[in-house]
Amino acid sequence: MVKIGLYGASGKMAQSIISCLKDEKDATLSVAFSQKNEVENLSSELLTNDFAKFFEACDVIIDFSQKEATVALLNYARTNPKPLVIGTTGLNDDEKNLLHLASGTMPILYATNMSLGVAVLNRIARIASKVLREFDIEIVEQHHRHKKDAPSGTAMTLAGCVAEARDLNLKDVLVTGRAGMVGARSKDEIAVMALRGGDVVGRHTVGFYNDGEFIELNHTATSRATFSKGAIKAAIWLKDQSSGLYSIDDSLGLDD
């Protein structure tokens, strides 16, 4: 039985993970980290705001917190190694570099989306990008009104997949908004547009558009449990891995 430590226990994703762990046969929630004294659906015995106690009480940590909290977790873990599953989005280049640095002494799985469906979508989109080289690529993502980062980490990962498949540097071709007289679309341009509203859990569409035809690939998440179950399975897998930075593809056994 893998002992899971939940970091950022008061968040919506954390609440979903707590619920999913109740039905999990191979893992259990052993401790939860929060600055709050009370967290919904958690007994006070499981709660702590002390890093040392938190790390000691678990085999693997799952983190879906905010980026500042993730940085604090990584900095502590660098001298107290522990397998980490990190799903925090909106990380900048410096924060991603910290991930790489920390993975030198512990196994870290970082993914902007933990669902099997999105992992498959990324694979299919990569293939389509190679084959449909003359097609324009546009990505649209939609989330609930409370999501803080835009475009979503999932959409940016998807954009990275299709750019890499065409041997393009995403930073050189990325467009995240259009307004006014912007001129004609460039050949290599990859656009990522964000919609926000309601309680949409997550919807991502990557379109390949050409004269006379187009293809759109779509993934819709209808419940946060999709991501929670993926994170739990990733944590169970990560427990026995050596130091290094892993992706969700690694945990699913998807080959390049």
From Swiss-Prot:
Alphabetized InterPro entries for the sequence: DapB_C, DapB_N, DapB_N_CS, DHDPR_bac, NAD(P)-bd_dom_sf
GO CC term (a single one): cytosol
Top-tier EC class: oxidoreductase
Record-annotated active site: H143, K147
KW Cell membrane (keyword) present: no
UniProt cross-references to Pfam families, sorted A to Z: DapB_C (PF05173), DapB_N (PF01113)
Residues involved in (S)-2,3,4,5-tetrahydrodipicolinate binding: H144, G153, T154
Signal peptide feature range: none
Catalyzed chemical reaction(s): (S)-2,3,4,5-tetrahydrodipicolinate + NAD(+) + H2O = (2S,4S)-4-hydroxy-2,3,4,5-tetrahydrodipicolinate + NADH + H(+); (S)-2,3,4,5-tetrahydrodipicolinate + NADP(+) + H2O = (2S,4S)-4-hydroxy-2,3,4,5-tetrahydrodipicolinate + NADPH + H(+)
Pathway(s) per entry: Amino-acid biosynthesis; L-lysine biosynthesis via DAP pathway; (S)-tetrahydrodipicolinate from L-aspartate: step 4/4
Binding-site residues for NADP(+), renumbered to this chain: K36
UniProt main location, coarse: cytoplasm
Highest taxon of the lineage: Bacteria
Annotated positions binding NAD(+): G8, A9, S10, G11, K12, M13, G87, T88, T89, A111, T112, N113, M114
GO molecular function, a single term: NAD binding
NAD as UniProt keyword: yes
EC number: 1.17.1.8
Cellular compartments annotated: Cytoplasm
GO BP annotations, alphabetical order: diaminopimelate biosynthetic process; lysine biosynthetic process via diaminopimelate
Keywords on record: Amino-acid biosynthesis, Cytoplasm, Diaminopimelate biosynthesis, Lysine biosynthesis, NAD, NADP, Oxidoreductase
Family to which the UniProt record says this protein belongs: Belongs to the DapB family.
Function: Catalyzes the conversion of 4-hydroxy-tetrahydrodipicolinate (HTPA) to tetrahydrodipicolinate.
Protein's name according to its UniProt entry: 4-hydroxy-tetrahydrodipicolinate reductase
Organism: Campylobacter concisus (strain 13826)
Gene (name only): dapB
